[in-house]
């Protein structure tokens, strides 16, 4: 997951707002969130609501950074396409600007997904940083105010695989989390269906270290918007402490789930490493580790290959026990990320069109194989193909 002022022709005028963060009173636990809304609605039919195993078990489709196989990620166009293509949820990854505004970026590094390098006025901002163990040289979101970010334009991250998406380079600005909420609310009203949000708090330990902690800003935004008070929100993180903090603040609410992201490797979450802990992601994926996750989270989200690993030849192997192990302790399993190009598919689902070619049939077939594991939802760069796999 590991990732505008809006062109008039693509915006629904009159709903995009840049609301101020709510006051300290809205940072209280779930009781305040409840108090700011009217009587609790019946959420049983909403996407993402309901216990594991309850009701018809159709996996949820999460639009990964929107429909990022078809439009530049985290843009209005990407989210609009994901919604039009049937995503149950759309995903904004959240980073902080220098002035404390939460914006949708997959990582703090701006150079791969915006045209910042072409802005001479920002040349002096180029620097080198190591964030979550990765070192990059370029430009970073926390060195820019929101007003400065709004002068940049989004570009396609993977143009060699997604030339169709790259045609939209330069058309869209960086979105705030609040703009995404308002856009989602308007789309839900226009389409007559609930659309969930699955935001990820990115680099929490890093942002806290530079005086820009994400969590309370995030909570105040959830509380300030009627849509996020009432409708499905799944909150993701690769870290542990911030999810535990969220659980303490939010309590148990029917429309909210906490999602522990994991990788199936023997490395530590960043907050664990900083605190000198020894817990690794690999340990978190064991039955004992999953039991611990279930004490504070509702969902575990591993990479897809943790459910069905690859053989040495790149084809799919036998199904692992992860889904069954997670379900035994009451966790949903919602892996990431299905991508429709041959390069990203298991070898047994590729065609002969070349490594960079888009392969819709292969992608649908691969997703179907994973649906058979019993997973409860999945992230995909192309929600239309995810929806087709469920048909």
What is each residue range found by the language model?
Residues 1-11, 21-28:
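N-terminal secretory signal peptides
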Residues 106-284, 288-289, 296-298, 302-309, ...:
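Metal-dependent phosphodiesterase/phospholipase catalytic core, i.e.
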Residues 81-94, 292-299:
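Catalytic domains of carbohydrate-active enzymes, especially glycoside hydrolases
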Residues 207-208, 249, 253-391:
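C-terminal active-site rim and adjoining tail of enzyme catalytic domains
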Residues 30-62:
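C-terminal segment of N-terminal export signals and the immediately downstream linker at the start
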Residues 96-105:
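Acidic helix-start/capping segments at beta-turn-to-alpha-helix junctions
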Residues 64, 82, 93, 149, ...:
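Conserved, mostly hydrophobic/aromatic
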Residues 57-89:
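N-terminal binding-site loop/beta-alpha segment at the start of enzyme catalytic domains
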């Amino acid at each position: 997951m590991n990732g505008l002022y809006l062109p008039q022709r693509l915006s629904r005028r009159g709903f995009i707002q840049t609301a101020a963060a709510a006051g300290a009173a809205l940072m209280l636990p779930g009781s305040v969130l409840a108090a700011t809304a009217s009587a609790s609605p019946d959420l049983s039919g909403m996407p993402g609501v309901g216990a594991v195993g309850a009701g018809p078990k159709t996996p949820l489709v999460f639009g990964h950074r929107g429909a990022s196989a078809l439009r530049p990620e985290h843009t209005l166009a990407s989210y609009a396409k994901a919604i039009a293509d049937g995503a149950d949820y759309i995903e904004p990854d959240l980073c902080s600007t220098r002035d404390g505004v939460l914006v949708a970026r997959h990582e703090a590094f701006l150079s791969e997904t915006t045209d910042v390098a072409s802005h001479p006025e920002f040349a002096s901002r180029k620097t080198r940083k190591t964030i979550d163990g990765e070192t990059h040289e370029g430009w970073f979101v926390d060195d820019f105010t929101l007003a400065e970010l709004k002068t940049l334009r989004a570009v396609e991250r993977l143009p060699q695989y997604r030339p169709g998406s790259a045609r939209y380079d330069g058309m869209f600005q960086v979105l705030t989390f609040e703009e995404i909420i308002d856009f989602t609310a308007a789309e839900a009203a226009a389409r007559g269906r609930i659309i969930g949000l699955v935001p990820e708090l990115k680099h929490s330990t890093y942002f806290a270290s530079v005086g820009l902690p994400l969590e309370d800003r995030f909570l105040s935004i959830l509380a300030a918007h009627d849509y996020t008070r009432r409708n499905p929100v799944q909150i993701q993180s690769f870290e542990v402490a911030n999810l535990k903090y969220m659980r303490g603040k939010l309590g148990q609410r029917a429309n909210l789930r906490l999602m522990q992201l994991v990788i199936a490797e023997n490395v530590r979450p960043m907050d664990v490493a900083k605190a000198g802990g020894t817990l690794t992601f690999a340990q978190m994926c064991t039955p004992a580790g999953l039991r611990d996750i279930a004490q504070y989270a509702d969902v575990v989200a591993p990479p897809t290959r943790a459910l069905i690993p690859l053989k040495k030849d790149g084809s799919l192997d036998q199904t692992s026990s992860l889904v069954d192990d997670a379900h035994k302790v009451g966790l949903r399993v919602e892996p990431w990320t299905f991508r429709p190009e041959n390069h990203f598919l298991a070898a047994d689902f590729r065609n002969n069109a070349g490594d960079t070619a888009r392969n819709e049939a292969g992608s649908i077939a691969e997703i179907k194989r994973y649906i058979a594991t019993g997973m409860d939802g999945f992230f995909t760069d192309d929600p239309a193909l995810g929806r087709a796999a469920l048909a």
